[in-house]
Regions:
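Short, well-structured alpha-helical segments
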Residues: 30, 49, 53-56
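Residues that flank catalytic or metal-binding motifs in active/ligand-binding sites
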Residues: 33-35, 102
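A short gly/proline-enriched turn/hairpin at secondary-structure junctions
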Residues: 36-47, 59-62
Length: 129
């Protein structure tokens, strides 16, 4: 199977999701996920939109603020690829902000192509000090 990617501006659903994380609100921006979506970030294996939302919130609540930056976005229809950088600023002022690279694959739902069915991503390395 051959897949053709087109470089595009990031879609609003992606920007809205990152904004929810950056603002620590975890609200409607997560509606881009199918109700039974799966998320594999690093070693995570979260099943369901609400589990994705809750686990990301728990991770962010460990003591830092994130700010996501989109470097590039590629669209191949049912597969979307995003690359960027996230600024991770610790709540503890004695610790240094880090800027790990991110790469994410979003596999869209077969019956509703406005929803993410499977999110696979990597961020890092992430080390504070």
């Amino acid at each position: 199977m051959q897949v053709v990617f087109t470089k595009k501006a990031p879609p609003q659903w992606l920007l809205d999701m990152w904004k929810e994380i950056d603002d620590k609100t975890f609200g409607q921006g997560f509606d881009c996920f199918a109700e039974d979506a799966v998320c594999n970030l690093g070693v995570s294996d979260w099943k369901g939109r609400e589990a994705i939302r809750a686990n990301l919130k728990a991770f962010i609540d460990t003591g830092f603020t994130a700010m996501h930056h989109v470097t590039e976005y590629w669209d191949a229809g049912s597969l979307k690829v995003f690359r960027g950088v996230v600024d991770m600023t610790p709540d503890d002022p004695s610790m240094t902000t880090v800027h790990p690279t991110m790469t994410h694959f979003f596999y869209m739902d077969e019956t509703d192509d406005t929803k993410v069915r499977h999110w696979v991503g990597a961020v890092g390395p992430v080390t504070f000090g």
